[in-house]
UniProtKB/Swiss-Prot annotation:
Pfam families: NanE. Converts N-acetylmannosamine-6-phosphate (ManNAc-6-P) to N-acetylglucosamine-6-phosphate (GlcNAc-6-P). Belongs to the NanE family. Its EC number is 5.1.3.9. It catalyses: an N-acyl-D-glucosamine 6-phosphate = an N-acyl-D-mannosamine 6-phosphate. Pathway: Amino-sugar metabolism; N-acetylneuraminate degradation; D-fructose 6-phosphate from N-acetylneuraminate: step 3/5. InterPro entries: Aldolase_TIM, NanE, RibuloseP-bd_barrel. Keywords: Carbohydrate metabolism, Isomerase. Coiled coil: none annotated. The gene is nanE. This is Putative N-acetylmannosamine-6-phosphate 2-epimerase. One of its GO terms (cellular component) is cytosol. GO terms for biological process: carbohydrate metabolic process; N-acetylmannosamine catabolic process; N-acetylneuraminate catabolic process. Transmembrane segments: none annotated.
Amino acid sequence: MSNLSNLRHKLQNGLIASCQPVPGSAMDTPEIVAAMACAALAGGAVGLRIEGISNIRAVRRATDAPIIGIIKRDLPDSEVRITPWLEDIDALSAAGADIIAFDVTCRERPVSVADLYQRARATGCLTMADASNIDDGLLAHHLGIDFIGTTLSGYTQAIVPTEPDLALVTQLAQAGCRVIAEGRYHSPALAAAAISAGAYAVTVGSAITRIEHICGWFCDAIKQCETEKLTEY
């Protein structure tokens, strides 16, 4: 089995932990990101999704587990944020990413999806498409991109849904894609549902690594209960 085939096999039917702290938060340091990554692996995660060069370097020093690397940028002339530039591809590979993920949505972008894919292939890394719908995913699949993620489903519109897009997982899987289900998988039951729907692997982020979000969910539920109690009187 080749190294790339072995890497694909490691992810199959597994959990990928996205260790991306809230920007500027108390957890937002490379050392803490690396610690979160190691803790996730100790809990059974088979891979990691890491943003930023310094974070990827820190995680790579701590583990040889598969890393999906991304760089997020806020561009003045494009809504594309995830790994938009060719130099990002080179930097991610040099930092130690095994898989390079990039936005494949049909939006104005500084570099074409095809060019990003070709540059990533040239580094020897595997590739992952962050798609928003079936058209994005199929375009990426036909280009030859290794993994198709549902990462951006619901995030290219004004109102973000609360539930994950399991229907998109099924559509892509039926089209022959290696689907990485990602986006709003906030419970073990939803992660299992993604595998049942045909996902190759499932990425979970906020529910594992964003303490602020998790605490917020509990606080909101408690406040809702308090409100309901008050309306009874």
